[in-house]
Structures are given as C-alpha cells and as structure tokens.
Amino acid sequence: MTLRPGERDLAESLAANALAFLAAEPERLERFLSLAGIDPGGIRAAAASPGFLVAVMEHLMSDEPLLLAFAANEGIKPERVVKAAHALGIVPWERGFA
C-alpha cells in the first residue's frame, strides 16, 4: 500500500487519540489491557513498542460498538478509523474485521 505524505503520522495520531479514549473509562482500558495481555503497570513500557498503536487500532476494529463510539467522540466517520488502520498496516479482512 502506498501512503500519501503524512498519512502514517495522522494514523498514529488517531491511534493515540484512541488510546486516550480507552483510558477515559477504566472498563474500556481494563478490557483492552486484558485482551492485549498487558499488565496495567506495564502500559508505559508497552506503549514504547512499535506495535502498540497497531494493537490499539486492532482492538477498536474488533468491537463495532466501541469503534462507532470512538468515531462519534472524534467527530469523524468510522471509515476514517478504518483508513487509519490501513495506514498502520492493518488489513481488516485478513484479521476477521470485515
């Protein structure tokens, strides 16, 4: 996939917003951390991993109500989240998100 200049940066920014969205509600964050196998005390170390933002976006993409809530919170169409996920290298139909 060919990215336009700045597209990956925008996708990473949206993924960081998604993490903040998850962190805003303890239940959301706990579910993400549990499914990702991350201890709450290890979130800072995990966040330094190159794949962390990808994991955040994969989590959103795997839960349609959560994806829709995030998109509404951001004031964007859900398709924008999908495009950001693609820019981060996530191919939804290969991971069962279709």
Walk through the language-model features, giving the residues of each:
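Metal- and O2-centered redox machinery and metal/ROS homeostasis
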Residues: M1-A98
